[in-house]
């Protein structure tokens, strides 16, 4: 009997599930990083599929910067309750003590303390030896050269020149004392693949990905949403309601929206088919002087 060929989404799904099961089998204490974005939503769906009907043996870890969109936090808690996964939330206590924010300390310092240092704290406190993330190679040039199994030294630093070859679907999971691994099951997916899979599998995502009238101000060539009263308005600034959506989600003062009328999955996919810009165009941290993604990853970033 000849089986019908797998679609490209079926092949990507099978590869990702294989990687998730490989992580569960090879590592002592793996964890999945859950940022609440679309890629994390796909990863959670794949995790549930990989170990169904059992509860996934891998907990979720959310690094909370205290500046995420309110809709993201509500969605995070709702999905954890719906799926029954083991969700752990970490906030860098040092950052809280210093009251670090993107407003008072700037994007680079805020990202380093609340994201990078917060992540390293959580991994060390939890004793995790593998952290699964939703990064994809099509997102950014430094991620394009990262392996599926990306090894980090005892200080969680990434050396792009000291990575192991990966032959076909064979992964070397052996680590040296103190070494850990970041694992990226969505490495070979594109942004369009992610949206097509969300559509096919009916995966819930944060409503911020869909266009709606939202209060925004224009800053540095981007529309910044006024999500709460903590965002100080510049002289002469007045929030205006515009139909916008987000292609990527992070801390709200550092995440630019795009003007759009795409308020359904079908409309988002149609918009994606003609888009000529990167999904990370709205990440203000990427445009800061000296804030290359590779340098942040070398220092321990996702």
From Swiss-Prot:
* Keywords carried by this UniProt record: ATP-binding, Nucleotide-binding, Nucleotidyltransferase, Transferase
Give the coiled coil ranges.
none
Gene3D superfamilies in alphabetical order? HUPs
Q: Which domain of life is it from?
A: Bacteria
Signal peptide boundaries: none
A Pfam family per the record: PAPS_reduct
Asked whether the keyword Protein biosynthesis is assigned, the reply is no
- Please cite one Gene Ontology biological process associated with this protein: hydrogen sulfide biosynthetic process
Which pathway or pathways does this protein act in? Answer: Sulfur metabolism; hydrogen sulfide biosynthesis; sulfite from sulfate: step 1/3
Q: What is its EC number?
A: 2.7.7.4
Please list the GO terms describing molecular function. ATP binding; sulfate adenylyltransferase (ATP) activity
Q: Which reaction does it catalyse?
A: sulfate + ATP + H(+) = adenosine 5'-phosphosulfate + diphosphate
For whether the record's keyword set contains Nucleotide-binding, the answer is: yes
Q: What interactions and quaternary structure are annotated?
A: Heterodimer composed of CysD, the smaller subunit, and CysN.
Q: Which family does it belong to?
A: Belongs to the PAPS reductase family. CysD subfamily.
Query: What is the annotated role of this protein in its UniProt record?
Result: With CysN forms the ATP sulfurylase (ATPS) that catalyzes the adenylation of sulfate producing adenosine 5'-phosphosulfate (APS) and diphosphate, the first enzymatic step in sulfur assimilation pathway. APS synthesis involves the formation of a high-energy phosphoric-sulfuric acid anhydride bond driven by GTP hydrolysis by CysN coupled to ATP hydrolysis by CysD.
The name under which this protein is listed is Sulfate adenylyltransferase subunit 2
Originating species = Xanthomonas oryzae pv. oryzae (strain PXO99A)
**Encoding gene per record:** cysD
């Amino acid at each position: 009997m000849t089986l019908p060929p797998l679609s490209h989404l079926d092949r990507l799904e099978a590869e990702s599930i294989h990687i998730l099961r490989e992580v569960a089998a090879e590592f002592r204490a793996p964890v999945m990083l859950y940022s609440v974005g679309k890629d994390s939503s796909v990863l959670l769906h794949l995790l549930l599929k990989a170990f169904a009907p059992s509860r996934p043996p891998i907990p979720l870890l959310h690094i909370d910067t205290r500046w995420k969109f309110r809709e993201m936090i509500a969605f995070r808690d709702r999905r954890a309750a719906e799926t029954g996964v083991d969700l752990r939330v970490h906030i860098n206590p040092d950052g809280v003590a210093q009251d670090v924010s993107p407003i008072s300390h700037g994007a680079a310092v805020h990202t380093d303390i609340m994201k990078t240092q917060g992540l390293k704290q959580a991994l060390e406190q939890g004793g995790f030896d593998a952290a699964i993330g939703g990064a994809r190679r099509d997102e950014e040039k430094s991620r394009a050269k990262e392996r599926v199994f990306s090894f980090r030294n005892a200080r969680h630093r990434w050396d792009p020149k000291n990575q192991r070859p990966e032959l076909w679907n064979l992964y070397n999971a052996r680590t040296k004392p103190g070494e850990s691994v970041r694992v990226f099951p969505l490495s070979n997916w594109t942004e369009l693949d992610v949206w097509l899979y969300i559509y096919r599998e009916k995966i819930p995502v944060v409503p911020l990905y869909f266009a709606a009238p939202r209060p925004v101000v224009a800053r540095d060539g981007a529309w910044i949403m006024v999500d709460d009263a903590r965002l100080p308005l510049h002289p002469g600034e007045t929030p205006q309601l515009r139909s916008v959506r987000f292609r990527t989600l992070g801390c709200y003062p550092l995440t630019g929206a795009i003007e759009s009328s795409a308020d359904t999955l079908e409309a988002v996919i149609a918009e994606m088919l003609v888009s000529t810009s990167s999904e990370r165009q709205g990440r203000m941290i990427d445009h800061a002087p000296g804030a290359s993604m590779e340098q942040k990853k070398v220092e321990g970033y996702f």
